[in-house]
């Protein structure tokens, strides 16, 4: 599985803003330069992040962006769902009587649930504090 560039940019923008003073307003140009994101693309992603409630936009000469929530309240799942409305591995449409299909999709459902739980467990406060161990499950249950 390969993440879209847009999702990676959301991760990088959230990480950058999480490291700033919570009252500091940061311009899109600063974010783009420091995170090596094409400026016009960063503006598009920032708008999606604001629409999802992750950022506040400040207009005008001294305008820019800052987090709308504390970094501890923003998870990797929030970030991914800024771009991907729904995170699913595969639609589960099996024809009646296909035993192998239902077994496969049952396993995929477990993988998907584990993946979503792990995305919800990791927040941007933890990601900006490298000495804090992440609570991620390694096993599929």
PLM region spans:
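N-terminal helix-turn-helix DNA-binding core of bacterial DNA-binding proteins
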Residues: 5, 9-11, 15-37, 56, ...
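Key DNA-contact positions within bacterial/archaeal DNA-binding proteins
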Residues: 40
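C-terminal regulatory/oligomerization modules of transcriptional regulators
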Residues: 95-141
């Amino acid at each position: 599985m390969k993440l879209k560039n847009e999702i990676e940019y959301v991760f990088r923008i959230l990480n950058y803003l999480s490291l700033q003073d919570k009252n500091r307003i940061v311009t899109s140009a600063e974010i783009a330069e420091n995170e090596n994101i094409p400026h016009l693309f960063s503006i598009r992603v920032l708008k999606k992040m604001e629409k999802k409630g992750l950022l506040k936009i400040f207009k005008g000469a001294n305008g820019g962006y800052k987090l709308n929530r504390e970094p501890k309240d923003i998870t990797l799942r929030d970030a991914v769902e800024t771009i991907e409305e729904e995170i699913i591995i595969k639609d589960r449409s099996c024809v009646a009587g296909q035993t192998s299909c239902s077994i496969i999709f049952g396993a995929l459902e477990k993988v998907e649930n584990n993946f979503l739980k792990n995305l919800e467990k990791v927040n941007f406060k933890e990601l900006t504090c490298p000495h804090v161990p992440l609570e991620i499950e390694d096993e599929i249950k």
